């Protein structure tokens, strides 16, 4: 009711607790800037992938966080689950934050492949053209393909359960199914 009153009587479409779905009130508006889908509805999901296309961590966020604040937490989760610091961390430009990159370097990560699209600094431009940096970005591009597979093969494009717990369960089942396929593929090669 508050949202309706603000829109109709107050002529204010910018309501902080905007409800976009009556059936799933926790649904959020997600703007990614894609030409084909400028606005999507749902929840933000962070996925971390290691070698052999195995997903090591995922998180379904209740409220969409700022991507640039997630890098250190992602590396900490990796260290906690796998017991070692990664040699290379790759993410898209939304994760760029000088303070986060510095903190990740202090943790012992050798190579951080997170592009800074807005920089004019020639040193940073040169780093972004190095072989290891480009390799990290190719890895990240492959991870985008993993997200597409999760959506198509395992139904992550639409959650069939209700509520935040249902969303966590649905995403978790999809990731478990995908990991089982990839683990089986790796074991078949080594058998």
Language model feature labels by segment:
Residues 1-88, 93, 103:
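Polybasic low-complexity intrinsically disordered regions
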Residues 17, 42-44, 86, 109, ...:
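Active-site lining segments that contact anionic ligands and/or coordinate catalytic metals
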Residues 21, 46-48, 57, 90, ...:
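Structured core elements
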Residues 34, 61-64, 136, 140, ...:
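Hydrophobic alpha-helical scaffolding
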Residues 50, 74-81, 107, 146-149, ...:
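Generic, well-ordered alpha-helical scaffold segments in large soluble proteins
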Residues 93-165:
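Helix-centered, glycine/charged polyanion-binding patches within enzymatic domains
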Residues 153, 157, 184-191:
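A short, flexible helix-boundary coil/loop motif
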């Amino acid at each position: 009711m508050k949202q309706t009153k603000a829109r109709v009587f107050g002529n204010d479409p910018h309501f902080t607790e905007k409800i976009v779905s009556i059936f799933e009130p926790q649904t959020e508006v997600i703007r990614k800037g894609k030409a084909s889908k400028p606005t999507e509805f749902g929840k933000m999901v962070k996925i971390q992938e290691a070698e052999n296309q195995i997903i090591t961590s995922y998180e379904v966020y209740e409220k969409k966080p700022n991507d640039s604040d997630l890098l250190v937490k992602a590396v900490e989760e990796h260290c906690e689950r796998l017991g070692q610091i990664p040699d290379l961390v790759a993410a898209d430009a939304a994760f760029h934050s000088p303070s986060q990159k510095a903190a990740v370097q202090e943790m012992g990560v050798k190579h951080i492949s997170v592009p800074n699209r807005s920089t004019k600094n020639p040193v940073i431009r040169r780093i972004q053209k190095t072989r290891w940096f480009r390799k990290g970005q190719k890895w990240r591009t492959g991870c985008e393909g993993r997200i597409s597979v999760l959506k198509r093969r395992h139904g992550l494009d639409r959650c069939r359960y209700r509520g935040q717990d249902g969303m966590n369960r649905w995403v978790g089942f999809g990731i478990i199914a995908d990991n089982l396929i990839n683990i089986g593929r790796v074991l078949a090669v080594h058998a």
